[in-house]
Design a protein with these regions (language model features):
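Nucleotide/phosphate-binding catalytic cleft detector across ATP-hydrolyzing
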Residues: 1-157, 174-175, 185, 198-246, ...
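Glycine-rich phosphate-binding loops at beta-strand->alpha-helix junctions
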Residues: 33, 112, 211-215, 272-296
Length: 366
């Protein structure tokens, strides 16, 4: 990755946003799908200082759990309590005011590589912006794309991005697992570019308009035009069948979904036999992906659009916008996380004039 190009891209995006929304942007939320996102479920317990559980006790036990998550080369993205315990009682959602002696917590900690996080911070701060929080992409995609019942009953959010595929598992209304791997939709594009001897730009266009992972109804005689590679205008275009595209695209998508299946089998999702899978991200829009995923994962699957943000224009309601929409939802749930003293997240709730102007800009700009 070229950090200078990344910085220029951030500057252009921020400049455009400031012009359209008529606000000066001083701080941002940053989502990441890189850095080998991983999860740990940790337990910690303390003796409570008074007869009943206080806010201070909750802070102390969360701090004890988060300290156990510190690993060389890793940085914490999220630290979320899953359930509390008090003496022999388990599964407590809100322990404040309850009477007991030994107070514990099961906490989910999501981390990423420190080097990746530092480079992202460097790019953003080089644009004279403060980073309010760095969040895991599949988590915020889930915030915008999952229905409440799905998060409560159990679901896996699979964000099929360009360079990565990331996973977030939800159960009991809680975010309980995250991970990812560095294969995504851009790998399908590169397979097409090589297989068809065409440019990456044309391969992406062909994938978007003609790509599919299911063979039903595809005729070998159904041909499409493929521009040649190179700058010689005299070279005639080639013609390939849509069945040829299928033979190039499907193996890579199968590989991605099989890796997802294996990761889910080793995650808390395996304990939820009736839980469903929700797909987001640009690569999830390939024709037939939901059907193929149902076969490979053996779970109910749907391709999701952002649900958690009202007022989005039609062009920003697709699966590819789930992460972006989730960043608008995240400030409303950020207070559920544990933050180290001095690093508390003071995020806008999305209820003021800024959010209204942002929504107006989105509607007017697309």
């Amino acid at each position: 990755i070229d950090l200078a190009e990344a910085e220029e891209a951030v500057r252009r995006a921020v400049d455009l946003a400031e012009q359209r929304a008529q606000v000066q942007i001083e701080s941002v939320l940053v989502s990441t799908s890189a850095g080998r996102i991983a999860s740990e479920l940790l337990a910690a317990s303390i003796n409570i200082s008074h007869a009943s559980v206080s806010d201070n006790d909750i802070t102390r036990v969360l701090a004890a759990g988060s300290r156990r998550a510190v690993r060389p080369g890793r940085v914490v993205l999220h630290s979320l309590p899953i359930r509390f315990t008090l003496d022999d009682a388990r599964g407590i959602r809100d322990p404040r005011g309850m009477v007991g002696h030994r107070f514990g917590v099961d906490i989910h900690v999501a981390t990423t590589d420190t080097a990746v996080a530092r480079n992202l911070m460097l790019v953003v701060e080089s644009c004279h912006l403060d980073v309010e929080a760095m969040v895991a992409s599949p988590y915020v995609a889930g915030l915008s794309a999952l229905a409440d019942d799905e998060a409560d009953l159990g679901a896996a959010l699979i964000d099929m991005g360009a360079g990565t595929t990331t996973i977030a598992v939800f159960s009991g209304g809680r975010f309980v697992h995250a991970e990812g791997f560095a294969i995504g939709g851009s790998h399908v594009t590169m397979d097409l570019a090589r297989g068809l001897s065409t440019t990456v730009y044309d391969a992406e266009r062909i994938k978007t308009f003609y790509g599919s992972v299911l063979g039903g109804g595809i005729d070998e005689r159904d041909m499409i035009t493929v521009p040649p590679l190179g700058t010689d205008d005299r070279e005639p275009p080639q013609y390939v069948s849509r069945a040829t595209l299928l033979r190039i695209i499907r193996p890579r998508v199968e590989e991605i979904l099989e890796m997802v299946r294996d990761r889910l089998a080793a995650s808390p999702f395996a304990a939820e036999p009736r839980a469903r899978v929700i797909l987001t991200g640009g690569a999830s829009q390939l024709a037939g992906v939901a059907e193929l995923a149902t076969r490979i994962l053996r779970r109910p699957v749907r391709v999701a659009r952002p649900l958690g943000v009202s007022g989005l224009p039609d062009s920003a309601k697709g699966p590819a916008f789930a992460v972006a929409a989730g960043l608008l939802v995240y400030p409303q749930v950020a207070n559920l996380e544990y933050s180290e003293p001095g690093r508390a997240r003071h995020l806008m709730t999305g209820t003021g004039g800024y959010a209204a102007r942002l929504g107006q800009w989105l509607r007017e700009s697309f």
